[in-house]
Every structure is written in structure tokens, then in C-alpha cells.
């Protein structure tokens, strides 16, 4: 891919050039923004990477010139700037930028960010895959021991976090190391059981001025999402209250329905779990990701088996590119856990097949399961799908593992 870098900082140009060249791209560059359009017309790159603040012509002007020129249609423009303000990001995206990356860049993730913006891929990352309770020690060496936390990084900079189990501390470490803690994000809570909210107070970006978060989820037993989250940070339980956070934090109560979140279509579905628990479907540019945890599919011979519910949920997740779902138990473990609000392998595989799911990610593993048990669960899921003649691809993600959707 041919990429043109426009930045008046020579060191930044050299750093980005080295990374992109190593990744196999053809790279051109200039530190003179006044010559940008001349260079673009002469070379017709696939992508232009530009800073905003430059002494001759700023990056937003370059973006506008490209957008207004019909001969330059198809060139992707990515902003790489030290400006952290939402206004600049919104303005750039509104004018057609393919992505917005905030300096300083992280050499470990920079090329992947550029690739995601160019191809409009969604980056899905697992920060905690366990359920109920964190699992420290060698039993969890392969898959990790942290509880529920998953992120979606969308091509235009939207950052969605799903649940705040202990995995959110691993995410926190990553954000502090790669972004200097700077983050504006949406935090979707499935439900307020401990393994989905209790590590939120340890998410360091919440304490950084200038950051902005919206926490979204359903009320529970008539208690709003704001009250649920605030209560666990009451000074009886935790030394720092919600009112002491230095970031801006907002709350939104959701029910089953359809929402616009940062311009992204989000659908919600009430799940079969004690109390209110929401599943989420994110629809973006012809692709979708479903986050369905915690949820119980009763077996067909159970008096609680609800075919109508299964069909409605199957319709909700139908044809999704990625289904992240509760698969807490092996089939032989499930009979002693009926009614606990979690599912076993065979039923998860059957519903994924029924819904024509493209990729199935097993999630929310029981704390008593070691890595070998999760390996067995994955093998059982593959066998079940094979018997059904399914095209669904199944995997059991490990902690910090990422996928491009």
C-alpha cells in the first residue's frame, strides 16, 4: 500500500516511516504541508497520514481539499495528532477522515491502528474471560484468570468497553502504558453482579482530568445504573467515592431496544439470568458483534426450556460476525448448576448454529475450571458444531488476545 505522511516534525515522520516500511508499505513523506496537495496529486497514494497543527496548511485543510477533489476520491485520510480534544476528532470524522490517532504513537500497535482505519476493521480484544471469580496461579496460565472485560476499537476512534470485571485492570495498565491514560470511552455493563463491575474503581483512566466516560446498562431491582455503580464506591466499601473521580462520568439507563451510541447502532436484549441482564449487538458498516453474557439455555428436557426465548435470541444474534457468549459449563458439569443463570457447551453450539453465527467465542469460564478443562470445552464445542454440519468457527480466546472483525 502506498502511504504519504505529512508532518512538520521530522522525528515523527521518520518514526512512522520506519514502522510502516517494516510492515511492507511503500512510504512517501513531506515536512512541508504547503506542498501536500501537489504531492498527493502527483503520487495518488492509497492513504494520507497527516498531523493537524502545521505552520503552512493544517491537517484539517488538507483533509477538506482531498474530500472536495473528485479526482482524489478513494484516498483514505488518517489524522495523527497530539490534540486530544473531542471537537477535533468529531470535526475530522465529519469531514471524512478514516481514523484519528492521538500522539504519542505506540510502536507496538501503530501499524495495526493504521490497518484498521484503512480497512475499517473493528479490533476486538479480550482482557478477562473468566466468570464469577478471578483465578490466580498456574491453573489459569494459558487463558488467564481475570473476569469479564472486552473492548471494541472502531475505525473512527470510538472505544467501547464491555463489563468491568477484574480484566478492566489489565485494560487500565494497557491504556496507561500506550495512551498516557488518555481515553474517552463508553462502558457497557451487562448486569451488576460482582464479576462484572467490581474492578471499575481500579480503572486508572477514571482518575485523569479531561477523560470522559459514559456508563450504560440496565437498572436492577429498580435501582438505576448510576446508583448501582455509585453504591459500590461508597466510602464504607472503598476509600474513593464516585464524586472524587477527576474524569467526566455520565450514566445512561438502557432497556431492551435500539440506541445510537456515538453514531453507532447498538441493540439490546434482556437475557435469561437472575435479575436484569442485557446482551448487546453492535452494528457497524455491515458487520456486527454480539456480547451475550450471563445467560442460561435450559436443556430441551427441562420444564424451564423456552423455545420462544431461544428463537428470539437466535434472531437477535442472527448472522453476526462475532458472538461472545456465556459458556460457563461442560455438559457433564451443568446438571448440578441448573438455574444458576449460565449455559453449557452443547446448547451454546446449537444456538450459534441455528443463528448462523460466523465466529463463536467461548467466554465466562467457571472459576473451578483449569486450562485443561477449557481446552476440553473448546474441543466439545468443535465436535458439537461438526455434528450439526455447522459453518460456525469456534475459539476460546486468551487474555489480551485480539481479533480483527
Please state what every model-predicted region is.
Residues 105-114:
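C-terminal output helix
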Residues 13, 55-56, 73, 85, ...:
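The feature encodes the CheY-like receiver
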Residues 298-391:
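Cap/insert and terminal regions of metallo-dependent hydrolase folds
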Residues 24-31, 39:
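Short hydrophobic/Thr-rich beta-strand motif most characteristic of the beta2 strand and flanking loop
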Residues 14-22:
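Charged docking surfaces used in two-component/phosphorelay signaling
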